[in-house]
Amino acid sequence: MDPIRSRTPSPARELLPGPQPDRVQPTADRGGAPPAGGPLDGLPARRTMSRTRLPSPPAPSPAFSAGSFSDLLRQFDPSLLDTSLLDSMPAVGTPHTAAAPAECDEVQSGLRAADDPPPTVRVAVTARPPRAKPAPRRRAAQPSDASPAAQVDLRTLGYSQQQQEKIKPKVRSTVAQHHEALVGHGFTHAHIVALSQHPAALGTVAVTYQDIIRALPEATHEDIVGVGKQWSGARALEALLTEAGELRGPPLQLDTGQLLKIAKRGGVTAVEAVHAWRNALTGAPLNLTPDQVVAIASNIGGNQALETVQRLLPVLCQAHGLTPDQVVAIASHGGGKQALETVQRLLPVLCQAHGLTPDQVVAIASNIGGKQALATVQRLLPVLCQDHGLTPDQVVAIASHGGGKQALETVQRLLPVLCQDHGLTPDQVVAIASNIGGKQALETVQRLLPVLCQDHGLTPDQVVAIASNIGGKQALETVQRLLPVLCQDHGLTPDQVVAIASNNGGKQALETVQRLLPVLCQTHGLTPDQVVAIANHDGGKQALETVQRLLPVLCQDHGLTPDQVVAIASNIGGKQALATVQRLLPVLCQAHGLTPDQVVAIASHDGGKQALETVQRLLPVLCQDHGLTPDQVVAIASNNGGKQALETVQRLLPVLCQDHGLTPAQVVAIANHGGGKQALETVQRLLPVLCQDHGLTPVQVVAIASNSGGKQALETVQRLLPVLCQDHGLTPVQVVAIASNGGGKQALATVQRLLPVLCQDHGLTPVQVVAIASHDGGKQALETVQRLLPVLCQDHGLTPDQVVAIASNGGKQALESIVAQLSRPDPALAALTNDHLVALACLGGRPALDAVKKGLPHAPELIRRINRRIPERTSHRVADLAHVVRVLGFFQSHSHPAQAFDDAMTQFGMSRHGLAQLFRRVGVTELEARYGTLPPASQRWDRILQASGMKRVKPSPTSAQTPDQASLHAFADSLERDLDAPSPMHEGDQTRASSRKRSRSDRAVTGPSTQQSFEVRVPEQQDALHLPLSWRVKRPRTRIGGGLPDPGTPIAADLAASSTVMWEQDAAPFAGAADDFPAFNEEELAWLMELLPQSGSVGGTI
């Protein structure tokens, strides 16, 4: 084989030996004609021109010189863009998530065919009318079409009938010609079938494979196929051969993955442009980073975007106030050139005339079709706001996606119909439209909502939930088709089907569940619930297929359990995470000293693949150079966005410690949450401002930042602290208490809005409002109190103090459960008085109420046996229920939790021992009570169940039996065994209990040395350790549903949706939270039995 000679300035390229399909076939890059059967098939062919020359210096690109991107789109049905994109969803997975880059490539490929195909772009912009049939010279360029060789039977070479059908007849002879060479290079039949999408690449890969591997040694067969099957794949591979060496060197120093990404997504022109302009792009005044160059180039039209960035970045930054990062974000999409030019033209108009912010304009422009979306916003924003009642923020949300133009036009047309005829709200219509393919989803909701509700029993809310994702149209149609099958044949519930469908790629996930559920259950021993849990994420299809393939390997070769495999797979990017665990688990354990459990913990989050790779790379650096422990590194990595958090810790830890006086432990506490990267950056920026201008301490700033959404909470404190203190009479301490929880931003905004209403109209005090708001989910709790307090007080006879106590312990869910019970009494709770119900709700939240509803096995007999063992109801045995509620409420409302214990002794006239004993009975250790760090109600309930004699085993999150029901059955069995055993003396019980008082909270207040014991599932106890306990009253109640584009940075719309899409955290066990909570003695068991129904009806439902 002749060697590939180096690139020369000559426009002609030396031909490779062998066939040159790139130069004779219209499907090659040289652009004779579009694919057969394409929408532009009849348009005249464009004169063939050489495209091998190096890009010229920055100047207006000629690629669209005859018309704009929108002119191109007008040449054919606009729906082609969306249909092609969404029909490519089987491989989409998570297109906007770093966890699934391969899926993004498929979107690029789909868009290339539908939106901006290089061979047809220049045809579409010509002024000549289309011909009725292809030109004769186009046929002349394909002698193989009429050749008998086109009828070759590839099955003789081992291809299946299905594989042969995927290969176009005219390409089969080329496949046969290069089959032997490609197989010899290690390509499979499936690889060759994929490569045949671009026939020119078959010969190129067959002839130059060894050269490709020498130039790109890390490239896999899949990588080569991924580049080769694209429109300019053959020439892109040739360009990599000649230019990879220089691109690997300064100033870009690109790695193999980056080179392949540019070639795969941007094509040959992007590779050539990056090579030609590498010095200009990275030097002054642009100063782009290699990652930014790759991001811009790795798109359709990447070469034009690079040219436009060189021309417009200085203008947009200096004249329009954008940042270089914003310019890069706009350019890093298909059509980036047009989007940048439109931003330059429309940004002043949209901001001055329509009231948008530059950030909103950037958000709209930073998508495929950004140019058209901006123009449509300019045209329709007044109409949608004035005539349809939408807000500018809602219009921006709709426009800020691929296909935003079509979505806005469809909202204008269908919003009245969907609201008036189908009962949807404008917010629901906006939610459906605010995704790629929003137009098609809205039209499908209009068509299928009546059918799904009437024929299949779904609710409108469920239909909206399915439609409000990428691929909503296809998901709705698939639910209509498969819901009966999955329920009747596979035993799923409609709710489970809806949950699977309510993700990006829901269609493919449902079809894969139908296909693989029997296999995974029968062959691999998974439960249907576990299969649903894996499927119930973006990329569920790929995750299920990977579990089928890797579960035996991971269990047999690496010692993982099926539950661990399921936990890894049950996240966005689960497919990639599983493959990375298989690859890196031995390395991380042997070379870095991690345990398999730690590896699983890191992988069991969105973006687990990237987090594992970053731990492998940065763990030695963070430990040796920055003094962190491996446990601290694992804790940071074990969150959504762990990769970014680790990299930011490496970068900012010295700055935050040296310049701002934080400790490494505080930096870890901030980073150890979803969105840790953003929180760290915001602390660096706002800590001086909050301390100097607002009087906060660094400890308070750290407390606010050490939660999911810490960035937003800090920014909201900066904005609202003066307002809440001056206008509403709160203290800075109270503002910090509200902000120092997950969802602190939303809680602060809700306090600002509802505090006057709750105080003036409902008679609450500001202290009570703060107590309700100072928890995870404070926003929802406040809104629920506003809605249900009149009902509970007027209709059911509760006092406002009782309502506040329920809301401060169990939140929104406990309040709704109490209302449901009082309105429609459940037989299992009918024997309880209102005081009993309130006490139970304060003690264990909704999990406790639900547990009693589901029934305590053999409860009447157990209660009778306890009464026989301890016949006297002594005063120290049964506490007054109202008293328990008052004590809990006192602690929850105390503005200085660390002083609450001493104040409570005075307030209630109790001794230290008596108050500690009361708290022990409600699942609080003495040390927690002394420092005011009461655990969440759900955690206290778990402890009570354990202390009652149950050996707590962490259930699978997808267990078929609910945790509460399983807990109660085990509790009953254990309690019965205890009662049958010989009775120890009461003093012995007390001694035994005292000797075992070693709760997790004991460790939680001893200092940083124990902070990072590997309990990554309980972040509220990790980060608490570096802060005064008065700031760390962590009582999570709810976890907000819905995927976030940037993990851990929720926006208002995401958290607002939590009122309708809520994943219950109450019922989930707190891993390790009660591992060593001391067992109850008989007096305490009797006290617990007094809290539960004692009539025979308790066991009636067992």
From Swiss-Prot:
Short motif (Nuclear localization sequence C (NLSC)): ranges: 1034-1037
GO molecular function, one term: DNA binding
Record field: compositional bias (Low complexity): 141-151
Membrane-crossing residue ranges in chain numbering: none
Gene Ontology biological process terms, A to Z: symbiont-mediated perturbation of host programmed cell death
Core repeat repeats by residue range: 288-321, 322-355, 356-389, 390-423, 424-457, 458-491, 492-525, 526-559, 560-593, 594-627, 628-661, 662-695, 696-729, 730-763, 764-797
Family to which this protein belongs: Belongs to the transcription activator-like effector (TALE) family.
Organism: Xanthomonas oryzae pv. oryzae
Entry keywords, A to Z: DNA-binding, Host nucleus, Hypersensitive response elicitation, Repeat, Secreted, Transcription, Transcription regulation, Virulence
Biased amino acid composition, Basic residues: 130-140
Summary of the function given for this chain in its UniProt record: Avirulence protein. Induces the hypersensitive response (HR)in rice plants carrying the resistance gene Xa10. Activity depends on the presence of the core repeat domains; replacement with repeat domains from other proteins (AvrBs3 of X.euvesicatoria (AC P14727) or AvrXa7 of this organism) does not elicit the HR. Probably acts as a transcription factor in its host plant (rice) to induce plant resistance or disease.
The organism's place on the tree of life at top rank: Bacteria
Name of the protein in its database record: Avirulence protein AvrXa10
Compositionally biased tracts (Basic and acidic residues): 978-990
Residue ranges of the motif Nuclear localization sequence A (NLSA): 951-954
